[in-house]
Amino acid sequence: MAEKALEAVGCGLGPGAVAMAVALEDGAEPPVLTTHLKKVENHITEAQRFSHLPKRSAVDIEFVELSYSVREGPCWRKRGYKTLLKCLSGKFCRRELIGIMGPSGAGKSTFMNILAGYRESGMKGQILVNGRPRDLRTFRKMSCYIMQDDMLLPHLTVLEAMMVSANLKLSEKQEVKKELVTEILTALGLMSCSHTRTALLSGGQRKRLAIALELVNNPPVMFFDEPTSGLDSASCFQVVSLMKSLAHGGRTVICTIHQPSAKLFEMFDKLYILSQGQCIFKGVVTNLIPYLKGLGLHCPTYHNPADFIIEVASGEYGDLNPMLFRAVQNGLCTMAEKKSSPEKNEVPAHCPTCPPELDPIESHTFATSTLTQFCILFRRTFLSILRDTVLTHLRFMSHVLIGVLIGLLYLHIGDDASKVFNNTGFLFFSMLFLMFAALMPTVLTCELICLAKMAVFMREHLNYWYSLKAYYLAKTMADVPFQVVCPVVYCSIVYWMTGQPAETSRFLLFSALSIATALVAQSLGLLIGAASTSLQVATFVGPVTAIPVLLFSGFFVSFKTIPTYLQWSSYLSYVRYGFEGLILTIYGMERGHLTCLEDHCPFRDPQIILHELDVEEAKLYMDFLVLGIFFLALRLLAYLVLRYRVKSER
C-alpha cells in the first residue's frame, strides 16, 4: 500500500489521487473528492424575475395553408415566380418556446419574417391572432423581432440605450422608467456593465442587451432569428434559458435555430422543422424520435436528435423529404402527439379559443408623440456624433487646416485690384471645399449605406419604437449644428487672412452663404446615400454628380456663353447660387474702388468685375431663396426615397 502511495506521488499526483489509489488497493470504496469547483444555480431562467414588467394580453398565432413566392429575376424579365414556402399550417401558443429548425436554405428566416409581418407581398394563406385574422399594424405593436446580428449603436452605454428604449416605449414617469430599466438589467445580468459602451460588450452580453431593449414594454410575442449564432456554449445556454423563462412567463417565443446541441435541443417546448420550404415535423420535442421511428427512421444511440433530423432533411439517408411532407399533410404528426399524450386531446388552458381584449397600448400608434420621439432621437444622434471622436475631429481639423492653407496661399489679395481673378478663384474653391466636405461624409455614413446603422434603424422602426418621420427629422437635424460650426470656423480663418472687406455685414453674409451651400450639399448626400444600393455605388455617384454642378456654376463658363440648349442646367447647379452670392457679397453692395499697386488695373471698379462675371443683374436675396428651396426639396426627396426603401424591405 505504501509503495502504491509513493508511486502515485512520484507520478506527480495530488493528495486526493493518492488517497484514491490507496483506497482502491485495499478494495475499499474510493473517497468522495471535493474540489473548489461548485455549480452555481442559474437564476436567470426564473420567470419570476420578469413579473415586474407591464402586463400585456397573451397571444396565440395560427397559420393556415401559408405559402410564399418571389419573382425570379428583374421585374422587366418575366421569368415567373419561385415558391419558397409551401402549404405551412400550425399553431404557436403562449407559454411555449418554439424552435424553427431546418438545413440552410430551408426557408426558416423567410417563414419567421412572414409570421412577424416583415414580408407581405407574395404571401398566400391566412394568419390568425387569437383566432381572428391578423391586423398587421396592431400585431407589430404587440410583437418584437430580435435579429441575428445584434447591431447596436456603438457610442451609447448599456444604460443609455435602455433609457432610450424606455422613453420611446413607455409613457410613465421617469422614476418608474429608471426602476424598470434597473430591474431588467439586473434580471439579465447586465447591471455590472450598465456604464459600458455597447461596442465593448461580449457576444452574449450584446444578445442579452438586444433582448432587454425589447423587454421594456413586455411584448407578448417575441421573434428571434438565430439567437445563438456566434456564441460559445455557455452564452448559448444563457440565451436559450432566458428565452425559455420569457416563454414560461406568458409570452409566445419563436426562434429559428440552425443546429442546436442536445442540451439546448431539449430546452425547446415545440419544434417546427422545415425542408425545401415545407414542414417535415411539428410537435413537442419528445415526440420527434418516436415519430421518426414510426416512419422507419431510427436515430442512432447517443446521436443528437437535432443533428439526425438535419441529416435526414439534407438527404444524407436518401431523398426522404417527399415521404415526410406527405406524413405531415396526412396528419401523422398530430396523431402521434395525441397518441403519446392522450391528456392533450383537448385544447390546453393556456391556448384559448376566445381572444382576450387587447391592452390600451395597442389602440395607439406609438406610446409617445412625434415631438417626443424627435427630441429623444435628436439627443441620441447628437450624442453619438459627439462621441464619434474620429469623424468629428477629422471634420473639424480638416476645415481648420485647409482654411489655414488657403489663407496662406491667397494671403491679403482681397483688396488688390490686380489679383481679382485670384480672389474669385479663392471664392470658388471655398464653395468647392465646403461642398465636398459636406457631401462625401454624408454619403459614406448614410443610414441606408452603413449596414450597422441600417440594421439598428430597421429593427427599431419595424418594432414600433418610433415613426419614420421622427427618425428622419432627428437624424438630419442633429448633424446641422456641425454643418454650421465647421463652415463658420473655415470662414473665420480664410476671410480675414485673405484680406476681404473688413465689414461685419459682409463677413456674416459670406458665412451664411457658405453654411447654406454646405447644407444643400449635405442634403444631396442624404439623397445619394438613400438611393444607392451599396457603398461602392454611393462612392461613385457622389463625385460624379458634383461634376455638372461645378461645370455650370458660372466660374468656368459664364451663363451667356453656355449654349441655349444647355442653359437650363445652370439653374440646377446649387454651387452657382452660392458662388454668385459670394461675388455679390465681396464686390457688390456699393463697395468702393479696390487698391491698385500697379500702373494699370482694369478691375479697380467692382462694377466692372460684376459685369465681367455676368452677375450685375443678380439679387443676393434670390441666391438665399434658391438655396433654401434646394435644401427643402432635396430633404423631402431623400425622405421619400427612405420611405420607399423601408417599404421595399417588406
Swiss-Prot record:
Regions that span the bilayer: 394-414, 424-444, 477-497, 508-528, 537-557, 622-642
Name this protein carries in UniProt: ATP-binding cassette subfamily G member 4
UniProt keyword list: ATP-binding, Cell membrane, Cytoplasmic vesicle, Endosome, Membrane, Nucleotide-binding, Translocase, Transmembrane, Transmembrane helix, Transport
Broad enzyme group: translocase
GO CC terms, sorted: cytoplasmic vesicle; endosome; endosome membrane; plasma membrane
GO BP annotations, alphabetical order: cellular response to high density lipoprotein particle stimulus; cellular response to leukemia inhibitory factor; cholesterol efflux; cholesterol homeostasis; positive regulation of cholesterol biosynthetic process; positive regulation of cholesterol efflux; regulation of DNA-templated transcription; sterol transport
Misc. remarks from the entry: Whether ABCG4 is an LXR target gene, is still under debate. Studies performed in monocytes, and in one astrocyte cell line indicated that ABCG4 expression could be up-regulated by oxysterols and other LXR ligands. However, subsequent observations in a number of different cell types (primary mouse cells, oligodendrocytes and neuron-like cell lines) have not confirmed this observation.
ABC transporter domain mapped to chain residues: 61-301
Protein family membership: Belongs to the ABC transporter superfamily. ABCG family. Eye pigment precursor importer (TC 3.A.1.204) subfamily.
Underlying gene: Abcg4
Distribution of this protein across tissues and organs: Expressed specifically in the brain and the eye. Expressed in both neonatal and adult oligodendrocytes.
InterPro entries per the UniProt record, alphabetical: AAA+_ATPase, ABC2_TM, ABC_transporter-like_ATP-bd, ABC_transporter-like_CS, ABCG_dom, ABCG_transporters, P-loop_NTPase
Taxonomic lineage of the native organism: Eukaryota, Metazoa, Chordata, Craniata, Vertebrata
Subunit structure, interactors included: Half-transporter that form a functional transporter via homo- or heterodimerization. Homodimer. Heterodimers with ABCG1.
Residues on Extracellular side: 415-423, 498-507, 558-621
Any Pfam family hit: ABC_tran
Coiled coil: none
Compartments, as annotated in UniProt: Cell membrane; Cytoplasmic vesicle membrane; Endosome membrane
Binding site residues for ATP: 102-109
Entry-linked CDD domains: ABCG_EPDR (cd03213)
Positions in the Cytoplasmic compartment: 1-393, 445-476, 529-536, 643-650
UniProt membrane topology term: Multi-pass membrane protein
Job description of the protein: ATP-dependent transporter of the ATP-binding cassette (ABC) family that may be involved in the cellular efflux of sterols, in particular cholesterol and desmosterol (a cholesterol precursor), to high-density lipoprotein (HDL). May play an important role in the removal of amyloid-beta peptides from brain,in a process that can be antagonized by desmosterol. However it is unclear whether ABCG4 can directly transport amyloid-beta peptides or whether peptide export may be facilitated due to changes in the membrane lipid environment. Induces apoptosis in various cells.
Catalysis: reaction(s): cholesterol(in) + ATP + H2O = cholesterol(out) + ADP + phosphate + H(+); desmosterol(in) + ATP + H2O = desmosterol(out) + ADP + phosphate + H(+)
